């Protein structure tokens, strides 16, 4: 019989961490982060990383495992997450995977082929970046990541630039490496219960703005200044393209003033939440909860207790 695992998924700013920690108080679960920003050390305030006290009480696997200068892909995440899950299961406990990076959840559950299938969320993100910055800018990023592939693709060949960047981000490998072998995807060897947090859109928009203002008050811009002062980080690195960090970097370069920075960062975060919500509604076999309704924690607890069985509740 395959071991059990729980997925707690939701858009940004829906209180996933607090709910996951509360569930860890009630069940024999250990937490695994599914967040493409939380893997990076030094991305703390702007990534809404759990504070040190929370991490001491409820350790999260896959938090602070990479330097911001290092790449991290869906394939790397899958390997790391499986190792963490197997370790948790070996201790007789249940992995509870919590986060909002749909690309990572999908890679973990479905596996990755050598040439991964198109991912709608990632494709939309690349399209939005191209609309803002132009396809030549994305081609320049491809040239940095895979010079050989970029040399074969015209800067304005949107379809091929997009597909090349998708493949690299999904697999963590260059196209030439992907073409060398075509392994079949490996399915997740776990029985999974999916729980999705989908709040009222208007409330979430307000929470996103309030949370960003709290981040500013907590010193978010100083955090980005320290990252810039390292000297080895650039704006095109995946860590620095994270929502909020990209806009802060541009603001500190003088691209726009503080008011415009705040507006752009909040807008980008709301767009991220919209993409995450679209993914969560796109046919996932998940039970849906409103995280801002009274009784949400109790309802989540009931669902997990039913899945795990009375012996573990």
Question: Where are the model-predicted features located?
Answer:
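Phosphate/pyrophosphate-binding catalytic cores of soluble transferases and nucleic-acid-acting enzymes
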Residues: 1-313
């Amino acid at each position: 019989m395959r071991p059990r695992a729980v997925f707690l998924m939701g858009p940004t700013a829906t209180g996933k961490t607090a709910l996951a920690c509360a569930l860890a108080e009630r069940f024999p679960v250990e937490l695994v982060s599914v967040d493409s920003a939380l893997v990076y050390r030094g991305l703390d305030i702007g990534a809404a990383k759990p504070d040190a006290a929370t991490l001491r009480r409820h350790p999260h696997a896959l938090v602070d495992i990479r330097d911001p200068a290092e790449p991290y892909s869906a394939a790397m995440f899958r390997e790391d997450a499986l190792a963490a899950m197997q370790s948790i299961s070996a201790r007789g406990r249940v992995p509870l995977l919590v986060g909002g990076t749909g690309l990572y959840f999908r890679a973990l559950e479905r596996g990755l082929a050598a040439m991964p299938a198109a991912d709608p969320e990632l494709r939309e993100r690349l399209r939005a970046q191209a609309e803002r910055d132009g396809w030549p800018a994305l081609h320049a990023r491809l040239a940095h990541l895979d010079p050989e592939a970029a040399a074969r693709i015209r800067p304005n060949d949107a379809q091929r630039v997009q597909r090349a960047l998708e493949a690299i981000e999904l697999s963590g490998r260059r196209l030439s490496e992907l073409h060398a072998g075509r392994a079949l995807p490996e399915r997740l060897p776990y029985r999974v219960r999916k729980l999705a947090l989908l709040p009222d859109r208007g409330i979430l928009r307000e929470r996103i703005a309030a949370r960003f203002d709290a981040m500013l008050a907590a010193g978010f811009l100083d955090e980005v200044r320290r990252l810039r002062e390292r000297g080895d980080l650039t704006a095109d690195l995946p860590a620095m393209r994270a929502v909020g960090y990209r806009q802060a970097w541009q603001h500190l370069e003088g691209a726009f003033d503080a008011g415009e920075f705040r507006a752009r960062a909040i807008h980008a975060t709301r767009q991220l939440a919209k993409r995450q919500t679209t993914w969560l509604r796109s046919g996932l076999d998940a039970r849906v909860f409103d995280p801002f309704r009274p009784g949400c924690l109790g309802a989540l607890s009931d669902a997990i207790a039913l899945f795990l069985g009375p012996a573990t509740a």
